[in-house]
Each structure stands twice: as structure tokens, then as C-alpha cells.
């Protein structure tokens, strides 16, 4: 999966930093420090984008086309959908599958964990490393 880069506006406050993502209307957060604000904005971007098909993600505005005011500054921030999903959408889901009875019997005799085997096979097939 690829990463999606968006310009993000950071605005220092008396206490902490406010953060806005102009290309994702209503996507904003804050943090007590710049580091915390960066972590929080990636989570906020994920919440905004999680129910949208990546092919329909809003197009990113060029950073030099974003208007800034006062102490605001802009940074390009990457949204990594795979990293977001691994962190926030790791809940197991049930899958129903069919295999020949003889294969099922052999696997059960050898105490094969079907869920574990399927996960490993899918990770391998998709070229994704386990983390």
C-alpha cells in the first residue's frame, strides 16, 4: 500500500499546537507538543479516511497553494493506510471457507491451526511482512 501525503497546518497556541488538514474538511486535532500533534494528526487523518476507498481520497493541495496566517506553518504529513489499519483495525474477523474433507482430516491429525496458516499464507501472497 502506498502512503498519501497531505499538507497540514500547524498553529502554535499558548499551550500546545492546533492542527488542521485543509484537504480533509473537519479533520483537525491538537497536541501538547509538536510531536504529539504529529501523532494525533495521523490518527485524525485515519479516522477521516478509513471509510473511503483510497482511489476516492481527496487530492492533496500543493503546499505553496495553502494560505497561512500569523504563526501558522505547514508540513507535508504522510498517511500510511497499512500502518493505520494494523494499529486500529487489527480485530480478528471470521471467515468461512471450504476445503476437501480429506485435507481437513490430515490437517486436524497434525494439529494445524487453520487461522494461523491462513494469515501466514495471505501475508505471503500479498507481500506484506508481519509486524
Question: Which residues make up each language-model segment?
Answer:
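A short, exposed loop/beta-hairpin motif centered on an aromatic-Gly-Thr core
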Residues: 25-34
Amino acid at each position: 500500500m502506498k502512503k498519501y501525503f497531505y499538507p497540514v497546518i500547524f498553529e502554535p497556541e499558548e499551550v500546545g499546537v492546533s492542527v488542521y488538514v485543509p484537504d480533509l474538511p473537519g479533520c483537525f486535532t491538537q497536541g501538547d507538543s509538536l510531536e504529539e500533534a504529529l501523532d494525533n494528526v495521523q490518527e485524525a487523518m485515519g479516522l477521516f479516511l478509513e471509510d473511503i476507498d483510497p482511489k476516492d481520497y481527496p487530492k492533496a493541495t500543493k503546499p505553496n497553494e495553502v494560505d497561512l496566517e500569523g504563526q501558522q506553518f505547514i508540513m507535508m504529513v504522510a498517511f500510511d493506510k497499512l500502518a493505520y489499519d494494523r494499529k486500529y483495525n487489527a480485530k480478528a474477523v471470521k471467515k468461512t471457507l471450504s476445503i476437501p474433507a480429506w485435507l481437513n482430516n490430515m490437517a486436524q491429525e497434525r494439529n494445524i491451526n487453520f487461522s494461523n496458516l491462513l494469515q501466514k499464507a495471505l501475508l505471503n501472497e500479498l507481500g506484506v511482512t508481519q509486524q
